[in-house]
Amino acid sequence: MSSRRTAPWFLAVVALALAGCATRPINAPLEQVDRKSGYRYETRAERPGNDPSTVVVLAFSGGGMRAAAFSYGVLEELRRTEVSIGGNRTRLIDEVDLITGVSGGSFTALAYGLHGERLFDDYEQRFLKRDVQGELVARSLNPFNWWKFVGGSAGRSELAAEYYDEILFNGATFGDLDRG
């Protein structure tokens, strides 16, 4: 083969080899943990208006967008429901001490943890009423995103994480939960 014919192949092999060297950033380990601060049950349980004698725990299951919509409906109903605790009227949502979620249910749990009452302003439009799966497929098929798949440094999960961050989480980190 002539050098003209081998040059493109050589460049392709070099590009693939270099792409194989790419790695995802790894979270730096914590040097020290302060158990009296940050987002944890012990620091969040005693909030103004929350009765310490009542513990309400929500567990949102998976199931994709249906689970996200169902868990959102649960929060809406808890927001509308008033109860009497210790002679005081309060909304049931104000008594929620802990929310856990997996898969589809985790979107609503996390969004509520980050945004609190603001969740009810635009969660439906920003997330529930979007064609999320269609957008993720479109991004996967977009040639401008294909470079992310080379070398194993990223994949569909990273594309999805970028999209969720763009439409729902806005660059939030675990540390932002403490402010919600």
Give the role of each language-model region.
Residues 2-8, 12, 20-180:
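Catalytic domains of lipid- and phosphate-ester/thioester hydrolases
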